[in-house]
Amino acid sequence: MTQEIQPGVFLHVLPTEKFKTVRFMIRFSARHTKDNAGARTLLTSLLETNSQNYPTQTALSSRLAELYGASFGVGMAKKGNLHQVNATLTLVNGKYVGDDALLAQGVAFLREVLFAPNISNGQFDEATFQVEKENMLSYIKSFAEDKQAYASLQLQQLFFKEDADQ
């Protein structure tokens, strides 16, 4: 089944009877640059926290609970010179809870959080933005304490010193 959830953005569903859960993963890929990496990372936290219809983290969590304890997350990955933003939703297969509309509700939830973020006047909610920005800065500062992550970062800097976008 293929569904267009936004112009130019398609959802492909591969039906199977093997699992009792349904997992959606939506991936947005773009070229990785030094200038966009921080903004994209912050964006993942902002999208994961709230949206227009779920303006607080509590409201978003309540909606996930209504979807039979669905789990949702937005993260990022780097593959070669691509920077990927991945949104994942996992929910129980509706046939096991007698809710045939659950799949459509899951798609609607993803559409809401991805395409109706908590923005007004062209800006993210200020309080949410500040909290997530501070969280990201704290995470970056903690790298020096994680010796394995710090060593990996230093290795990347040595290896890619000629390519500023890496």
Summary of predicted features, one role per range:
Residues 50-53, 94-97, 116-125:
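Short, polar/flexible loop-turn hinges at active-site or ligand-entry regions and domain interfaces
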Residues 1-22:
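N- or domain-start disorder-to-order transition segments that initiate the globular core
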Residues 40-48:
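Active-site SXXK
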Residues 116-140:
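Acidic/histidine-enriched alpha-helical segments
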Residues 14, 20-32, 58-112, 148-166:
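M16 family metallopeptidases and their MPP-like homologs
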